[in-house]
């Protein structure tokens, strides 16, 4: 169970909720602020002054006053009308993370919902009631309206949810878990759907997967360095200290540790006629390290956003209810674009290492396409082509999304972030990157084995052994698709990187 303190939740907690399915609830000390804001909204609803989302219409209809007798129906109508999502549903793990993020936002005590709204969300998370949320339809301002409406629909007994391995109507799913739908009070529907939690959940998932890929890239690229008998001189700490970037320094240190004790490296330390390795070998710390720095910058933004109150209007500490723009997901959009760039570049340089290893003119005496009998066998020829295809896909997906705004809601909402699909694409990019890195691992393992009787280092030998437990050495040609998939799984689960048994850079 993760006890979430609003404003203080950590990325480690959020990753545990997403990756491990940990349950989550708010710390009890959040309740007084939540209830105080709810009382302030109730007072506003009983008054005559117009308060957006309490006794007015929404968006372009904000100037229309709603009668006190209709405020409950107003909130219900809001949820129903905004359930306009399309496409495949969110992955359940990401949907649950989104729900936890909504808890954190409501827990700041600035949204004006009653504690029973918080309690129902907590109950759904505890009982495994996961709303079915179509993943397309948000432009990332005014918040992630459509997807969050599908979440809120289940809370009022509408929509659909998965529970106990079954997909049920919302009311039935709640009943299955011993929960009851809630009748929304003033502003509560708006508070549930106005926010960036959908985009942020997807961006965090991309971040967590991206960091694991970066760790794998360091390990696999070290194995590739030994496969082509690359130099470790460019990893010397003095070089990286003179530049000063933290990620570069860490990447070089990690690779030095991974290659320490390699007999392959020692065999060509003297008398090697090659003066410099190609950039994809020599500049690995500069590229992967820079990607790590970018991922950490994105992590800082997303950690802040995860703890933010992104509702509108907000109940301020002095009791005033004020309209603002915290629902605009521009920070999330920028973070997603940064993550996309990092994923693309990690894959781009990895693909060049694959290309280098299969090319006998560059691989320093490795056989063409890493097959023991080239000509009769094509070896890893088309595996390299697959990595090129996936690299190109990722390059296209790395184009920024925050620059593509369009006006909506009759020009009232005239600039939007497009953070939602900017964050969603990260899942596809990570899938592609895992295949690129897994294929590199297969090539590197094959290359290192061709250097026998010389052996790689102990840490990299353990990595090679872990790979070989899933992917046999390639002799005669065989169908390679299962091998590529198995290697990609080792990358995504972190098993390949962990096999080295060395500390790896932490997010």
Curated annotation (Swiss-Prot):
A GO biological-process term: L-histidine catabolic process to glutamate and formate
Subcellular localization, as worded in the UniProt entry: Cytoplasm
PTM per Swiss-Prot/TrEMBL: Contains an active site 4-methylidene-imidazol-5-one (MIO), which is formed autocatalytically by cyclization and dehydration of residues Ala-Ser-Gly.
UniProt GO molecular function: histidine ammonia-lyase activity
Enzyme class: lyase
Lyase as UniProt keyword: yes
Primary localisation category: cytoplasm
Residues with PTM 2,3-didehydroalanine (Ser): 142
Pfam family, any one: Lyase_aromatic
EC number annotated for this UniProt entry: 4.3.1.3
NAD in keyword set: no
Pathway: Amino-acid degradation; L-histidine degradation into L-glutamate; N-formimidoyl-L-glutamate from L-histidine: step 1/3
InterPro entries the record matches: Aromatic_Lyase, Fumarase/histidase_N, HutH, L-Aspartase-like, Phe/His_NH3-lyase_AS
Cross-link (5-imidazolinone (Ala-Gly)): 141-143
Keywords: Cytoplasm, Histidine metabolism, Lyase
Entry GO terms, CC: cytoplasm
Enzymatic reactions: L-histidine = trans-urocanate + NH4(+)
HAMAP family: His_ammonia_lyase (MF_00229)
NCBIfam families for this protein: hutH (TIGR01225), PRK09367.1 (NF006871)
Family membership: Belongs to the PAL/histidase family.
Protein name in the entry: Histidine ammonia-lyase
Organism: Cereibacter sphaeroides (strain KD131 / KCTC 12085) (Rhodobacter sphaeroides)
Name of encoding gene: hutH
